[in-house]
Regions:
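Flexible loop/turn segments at secondary-structure boundaries
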Residues: 8, 108, 129, 244-246, ...
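PLP-dependent enzyme catalytic core of the Aspartate aminotransferase-like
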Residues: 18, 29, 36-37, 45-46, ...
């Protein structure tokens, strides 16, 4: 999963044994597992905070050895919307960068750098490719964070690299220090170099991204509105709908749309969800998300199955939650498929 690899590189490019990071708790399951368990074995600990926490609660999570703050623009699958300005303010007050996973929103709907983020990651396997045809990821550095100003905290960037002819990245590369270290050190030693074929397919996807994203968003809103009016549906979560918990944040950060993913639950709970998904014909049950074809998934038993009940709730994943990734098909066809699947 490239989203996990990107997050790993983004953090470990500046963190080492004995360090600490602060993360919003609403995360993709694999990313949560990476921060809660895997990098902990490497000596880097994470403190998870509720995305809706107060500024006081957020600041209390920082430690002397904190190296970064991490969050997702739109959490998968909780769809919690990240409050950039709140987290950026706290990160910069503690002299650390804000790193944001912008996979779901894409740069079409949200530009995190404009709201205080310093580094942005993407699983390009999702909307950027858009056709589930290639695997890839990206780390984008704004060049805005002044690593040299806090040299003792980020010594990997401000002191000589013995593995690279004694280069001091901040002196040699200036604003490009972070991304140069990531490619010349981490990628050199750990790999993750995209193949030419994957790069070619990704480039094709990027050429139509600006056309596809509005359709994804439009289909998501229309499907959410349909589900809201169905007698068998207990709840619907679509951040772009008025009345949603994070609607004000959407209007602030993503007024033109969020993404093509919505979530909902049925009154019959988990059993009803499984039954309904099995009856779908056009919409497939797929672990993948965010491409041209519509698909559904039950995250609690798939993408987030490694998490316990408490961790699931903290990540915003209810036991009955169905994740619905709307593609770019005709919305009337998609609604008709859902309608027949909900029939007794």
């Amino acid at each position: 999963e490239m989203r996990i690899r990107d997050s790993f590189y983004a953090i470990m490019n500046i963190a080492e044994e004995g360090d600490h990071i602060v993360c919003a708790s609403a995360l993709y399951g694999g990313t949560y597992n990476l921060f809660a368990h895997t990098i902990r074995k490497m000596g880097v600990k994470a403190t998870f905070v509720d995305p809706d926490c107060t500024e006081e609660e957020l600041n209390a999570a920082f430690q002397e050895n904190t190296k970064a703050v991490f969050g997702e623009t739109i959490a998968n699958p909780a769809l919690t919307v990240f409050d950039f300005e709140k987290f950026a303010k706290a990160a910069h007050a503690h002299h650390v960068p804000l790193i944001v996973d912008n996979t779901f929103a894409t740069p079409i709907n949200c530009r995190p750098f404009e709201w205080g983020a310093d580094i942005v990651t993407h699983s390009t396997t999702k909307y950027m490719d858009g056709h589930a045809a290639c695997v890839g990821g990206a780390i984008v550095d704004s060049g805005n964070f002044d690593w040299a100003a806090y040299g003792d905290k980020f010594s990997g960037l401000t002191t000589p690299d013995e593995t690279y002819h004694g280069i001091v990245y901040t002196e040699k590369f200036g604003k490009a220090a972070y991304r140069t270290k990531a490619t010349s050190q981490l990628m050199r030693d750990l790999g993750s170099i995209q193949s030419p074929q994957n790069a070619f397919l990704l480039n094709l996807g990027l050429e139509s991204l600006h056309l596809r994203m509005p359709r994804h968003c439009e289909n998501a809103v229309k499907m959410a509105q349909y589900l809201q009016g169905h007698e068998k549906v207990a709840w619907v979560n679509c951040p772009s709908l008025p009345g949603s918990k994070d609607y004000d944040l959407v209007q602030k950060y993503m007024p033109d749309g969020t993404c093509g993913v919505i979530t909902f639950g049925l009154k019959g709970g988990r059993e009803a969800a499984v039954k309904m998904m099995d009856k779908l014909k056009l919409v497939a049950i797929v672990t993948h998300v965010a491409d041209a074809r519509s698909c559904v998934l039950h995250p609690a038993s798939h993408t987030h199955r490694q998490m316990n009940e408490q961790e699931l709730l903290e990540a915003g994943v209810q036991p009955d939650l169905i994740r619905f990734s709307l593609g770019i098909e005709n919305i009337e066809d998609l609604i008709a498929d859902v309608e027949q699947a909900l029939e007794d």
